[in-house]
Amino acid sequence: MISYLDNIVFLLAKGHQRAQGVLKGHLNAFGLTPMQCLFMESLWDEDGLSVGDIGRRISLDTATLAGVLDRMVTAGWVRREADPDDGRVTRVYLTDKAKGAFSDLSASIERTNNELLSNFSLEEKLLFKRFLRDVKD
C-alpha cells in the first residue's frame, strides 16, 4: 500500500493549503479572497463577461459564483448589468476601484507564485505548471 506521504491526493491537498494560505496573506490588504481575485483576473483578461463565461474560465458553476459576485458588487469591485441583447444574461464589469488595484494585485499574485516556487529552477517551474495543468485536465 502506498504511504499517505507519497499519495498524490494528499500532496496536492497540502500544496493547495499552503498556496491558498500564502495567497490569502498577500490579498488580506485588499480585503479579497483568492476566489474573488481569480474572478477579477478573468475580467482583467476580458471585461464584460457573462457570469457563465466567468464560470467556464475558472471552472466553477454559476450557482457557486452567485455569492462571490454578490459580495464583490457590495464591496465595489465589480458591477453587473443586463446584456443589452439578451436580458436573461448578466454581464460583469470591473469598477474603477478594481481597475486601479490591477497593478498592486498583479504584484501580489506574482509574489505568491515566486514565494511558492522559490526552490525551483526555471525548468522545474515550467514542468511543474505543465504537470498541474495535465492533472487538472
Residue ranges and their predicted role:
Residues M1-F30, L94:
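N-terminal leader segment of winged-helix/HTH proteins
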Residues N7-F10, L38, A63, E115, ...:
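Active-site phosphate/pyrophosphate-handling residues
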Residues A13-H16, E41-D45, S106, R133:
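Short, locally clustered residues in the helix-turn-helix/winged-helix DNA-binding domain
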Residues Q17-T64:
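N-terminal helix-turn-helix DNA-binding core of bacterial DNA-binding proteins
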Residues Q20, D70-R130:
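Charged, amphipathic alpha-helical coiled-coil/dimerization segments
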Residues G25, R71, D134:
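Alpha-helical DNA-recognition elements
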Residues W44-E46, I54-V78, L105-S108, L127, ...:
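Long, contiguous secondary-structure blocks with strong helical propensity
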